[in-house]
Regions:
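Structural preference for solvent-exposed beta-strand-turn elements
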Residues: 2-198
Length: 198
């Protein structure tokens, strides 16, 4: 029986364009920064994940009650965003989301002057938020808080009259844990012509 032989010769040069999926974390940060900038820095190539779609709807539909479902990033970022934008809104989510604590972020925003009330249980969503210009410009947090709390606060810094200085302190503070997220925030701010120093 005759055997067929095939010889495959690779090309000397391979040229291709690859579209990588965008991080939902970066997409959600970019959406908040764009919203604070009144749409002058529109993000491109956004993630198509559920969290990002929830964020887009929340920022564009203008509803008084915002349901972020199970999107934890959206809950934290929007809580800070709604605190500095005019209007009274309620932000809620799934039953599981309403069991996830958010008191550290709410306390920090209140310290800056935000008007936030718990709808049902102290320390947990849903939240009723009256957005306004915040007068505070400096805050200290323990070093073991969620990096998303840090990002949520830093992202609204440019919306504060005198900017924001955020101190992270305590024996539980490990800069290496937060540096990648802060670097991501700083990169997005730089693209949006916002000043950041560390």
């Amino acid at each position: 029986q005759e055997m067929m032989l095939y010889k495959l010769i690779p090309p000397s040069v391979v040229t291709a364009t690859i579209q990588l999926p965008t991080s939902k974390s970066i997409s959600n940060r970019a959406l908040i920064i764009n919203a604070l900038g009144k749409g002058i820095y529109p993000p491109e190539n956004l993630s198509d994940c559920d969290d990002t779609q929830v964020m887009i709807k929340a920022l564009t539909e203008g509803k008084e009650t915002i349901d972020i479902m199970a999107a934890g990033t959206a809950m934290r970022f929007l809580t800070a965003y709604l605190s500095v934008t005019p209007g009274e809104r309620t932000i809620t989510g799934t039953a599981r989301m309403q069991q996830r604590p958010i008191q550290i972020l709410v306390n920090a925003l209140r310290e800056l002057g935000a008007e936030i009330e718990y709808v049902h249980n102290e320390g947990y969503p849903p939240l009723c938020i009256k957005g306004a210009e915040l007068k505070g410009n400096e805050i200290t947090l323990k070093g073991n808080v969620s990096s998303q709390y840090i990002s949520a606060l830093l992202m609204i810094g440019p919306a504060l009259k005198d900017g924001l200085t955020l101190h992270l302190s305590g024996r539980d503070y490990f800069p290496s844990l937060y540096q990648p997220y802060i670097a991501t925030d700083a990169g997005l701010w730089s693209q949006s012509r916002m000043d950041f120093s560390q």
